[in-house]
Amino acid sequence: MSFYGLVDGSESSLKNFLNKLPGVDQVGAESRAAMLGTRSIKTTSKKWAIETAISMVDLTTLEGADTPGKVRALCNKAVRPDPTDPTVPSVGAVCVYNDMVQIARTHLDEIGGKHVPVAAVSTAFPSGRASMEVKIQDTQDAIDAGAQEIDMVIDRGAFLAGKYGLVFDEIVKIKEICGDKAHLKVIFETGELVTYDNVRKVSYLAMLAGADFIKTSTGKVAPAATPPVVLVMLEAVRDFYAMTNQKIGVKPAGGIRNTKDAIKQLVLVNETAGPDWLTPKLFRIGASALLNDLLMQRMKLATGYYASPNY
């Protein structure tokens, strides 16, 4: 089998491809990310940037204490982030644990949120430590319950041990289960990958295996979505597009808590992958607290006053 005509899926083919990738210039990546982080957006464009960021949020609750009531409240906010202003866009998705998918999907449909997808974390999130049978069942259960997006985690131990074929095969199998029913986001847990070179390699590995999105982190490990890491991933999707004519999305998650952070991410996207990626179809932000700050800043632009942070 050929994957984009670049590898055949074997361990030797994957190693040959990945080991030929150019190394990441650490100083250069960090300097460029820092430089782009100083870019400001004109006041006339700030409302657009804030609303674009809102539309890209994967509104998330992934806590052991999650309840059906909490998930329904999250869905209400996802559809109408500001109940007093119907012009505020809905978010990109609601992201929950497997057992909350049906509750989220049913409630979204009941409140006029059919357009908001439900994303489910899968494959023994957040550790990824389980048998393939468990990971497959985890994913199938989520899709059967109504998940339209699957956020799977890779086996970081296998990747760091150089077992690229094992990681690749797991992604391929989960992608097969998703089929045309669900988009697949592949979580790397970049805080455990040690080097930017590893981030670049795993980005290509996931894209070759069929990922629709590549995602930085579970949000459970720090550091998470640092600007240099996101930059490296955006460079990877840009270059992969040049190779294959296939656009892959990027989802930073973890540590993006305010509007300033979100706008920095949009600048990174625009200046690295390009403006085509400035859409929820190709860029998402995994967050829980971020939405409140985006709404506060949007109201400040409109009225000159801050609203309550407890939107």
Residue ranges and their predicted role:
Residues 1-54:
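Charged, compositionally biased N-terminal leader segments and the immediate start
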Residues 44-52, 65-89, 99-251, 257-288, ...:
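Alpha/beta enzyme core
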Residues 62:
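A short, histidine- and acid-enriched strand-loop-helix "catalytic/donor-clamping" loop
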